[in-house]
Amino acid sequence: MTVKFSQVSYVYQKGTPFEHVALRDIETTFQQGKYYAVIGQTGSGKSTLIQHFNGLLKPSTGKLQIDDITITHKTKDKVLKQIRKRIGVVFQFPESQLFEDSVEREILFGPKNFNMPIDEVKARAYKLLIDFGFSRDILQQSPFQMSGGQMRKIAITSILAMDPDIVILDEPTAGLDPKSRDQIMKMIKKLQVEQNKTIILVTHEMNDVAKYVDEIKIMKQGQLVEECSPRKLFSDTNYVNQLHLDVPDVVKLQRDIEDKYQYYFNKIALTEDEFIDMYKEWQEDER
């Protein structure tokens, strides 16, 4: 499932004194099976961009092409329903949107609205919940008796159980403990690798971007200013600082060691394991 933005702009409250241009002439493509990060400062247009994928917002000008479906400002809601089954969006703090009295009812609410095969949905949901570390009787429990991290996993499961081709996550690990954060990020990566899902991650957490992402799309003041790999972006720490973004911890460590020993590695490490291998190789060469 390929999504192409063609000269997409979006204006909030158009024609009023409060008019605000949130997106300006976005031209980009999201390919099936890749893991993307959409990054930028607060107010750069990230959340507005992702709301166009399933028609929560429609372009003020320009168009989206999602496989054979074209979305413009004139597109009818009945057309959008076709793509909403295939694109799952997990918004910030999704646990705040839970309302059913059992995990099973919560997970099945969306699929029932789309007339999906319930047995298949339950089977997928059950496997996801077990992978997240829940007990086998989880489906009959109330989500409101669980911790914040557990509720977040339930909310994410309710989207993933619908088996979307594209999974969009807006700050999915915000406010979570390290264990829950790690579980969620590993699960999402597993979906990409094993099921060829397209993943679109909106985040300020650059450690996750470095570790999991294939391609970065950088937003600034409603414009897409660059598309690049994590290694290319984080190799230029001055540029990262200019964007007012954090440098991943492993990159900070590498730069500190390079400055201390005046030895410069031939590439930037994106994970701890990668840096350990580079460091060991350097130490062996020094002997």
Swiss-Prot record:
Compartments where located: Cell membrane
Family annotation (SMART domains): AAA (SM00382)
Ranges of residues in domain ABC transporter: 3-246
Keywords: ATP-binding, Cell membrane, Membrane, Nucleotide-binding, Translocase, Transport
Record organism: Staphylococcus saprophyticus subsp. saprophyticus (strain ATCC 15305 / DSM 20229 / NCIMB 8711 / NCTC 7292 / S-41)
Membrane topology designation: Peripheral membrane protein
Protein name: Energy-coupling factor transporter ATP-binding protein EcfA2
Enzyme Commission number(s): 7.-.-.-
InterPro entries on file: AAA+_ATPase, ABC_transporter-like_ATP-bd, ABC_transpr_CbiO/EcfA_su, ECF_ABC_transporter_ATP-bd, EcfA2, P-loop_NTPase
GO CC annotation, single: ATP-binding cassette (ABC) transporter complex
